[in-house]
From Swiss-Prot:
One of its GO terms (cellular component) is small ribosomal subunit. InterPro entries: Ribosomal_uS4, Ribosomal_uS4_bac-type, Ribosomal_uS4_CS, Ribosomal_uS4_N, S4_RNA-bd, S4_RNA-bd_sf. HAMAP family: Ribosomal_uS4_B (MF_01306_B). This is Small ribosomal subunit protein uS4. Residues 98-158 form the S4 RNA-binding domain. One of its GO terms (biological process) is translation. Part of the 30S ribosomal subunit. Contacts protein S5. The interaction surface between S4 and S5 is involved in control of translational fidelity. Gene3D superfamilies: Ribosomal Protein S4 Delta 41, Chain A, domain 1, RNA-binding S4 domain. Keywords: Ribonucleoprotein, Ribosomal protein, RNA-binding, rRNA-binding. Belongs to the universal ribosomal protein uS4 family. It comes from Haemophilus ducreyi (strain 35000HP / ATCC 700724). NCBIfam families: PRK05327.1, rpsD_bact. One of the primary rRNA binding proteins, it binds directly to 16S rRNA where it nucleates assembly of the body of the 30S subunit. With S5 and S12 plays an important role in translational accuracy.
Amino acid sequence: MARYLGPKLKLSRREGTDLFLKSGVRAIESKCRNRLDVAPGQHGARKPRLSDYGSQLREKQKVRRIYGILERQFRNYYTEANRLKGNTGENLLVLLEGRLDNVVYRMGFAATRAEARQLVSHKSIVVNGRVVNIPSYQVSVDDVVTVREKSKKQARIKASLELASQREKPTWLEVDAVKMEGVFKRTPERSDLSADINEHLIVELYSK
């Protein structure tokens, strides 16, 4: 399955919520003119009642799109989450949050996860003193994530940090915006993450 390259706002409208795919320079609700609850397309205003399977599928698609992950990779994350001890749904979210591209985004070095993925792929990110260019790399507790020295002058990184300063900072991360460096202090708990995600529906979908 190819990665989606079309309009980002269309995906948010498809899921009926802000997927945080845009930089945040302008509120997505403003740009969509309060159309987030209207699906894209000619018949978008019609909202058919979803079956249980339909609701489960929509939730999976929403989370997959938030983190920018293809179907096969997402299923692999679920398999790993199911193998680990504890709640499978929560394990899944923790694995997704531990991706290097997501951590780079959460630390404020990139305005979107897609931009963070690009920074990682272009070797602009260092983990524990070593360049890592794999977006799916799993960050561990106490890992130090830094913007590579020669990349610190990039205007987009500085702009992203400015945007991040206006958002609530994740409590499981410690970030020094001046040094462009952060520490993955602890594994996030479910209460730290979005309440707008219903991971139980995803577990039900894959458990069939």
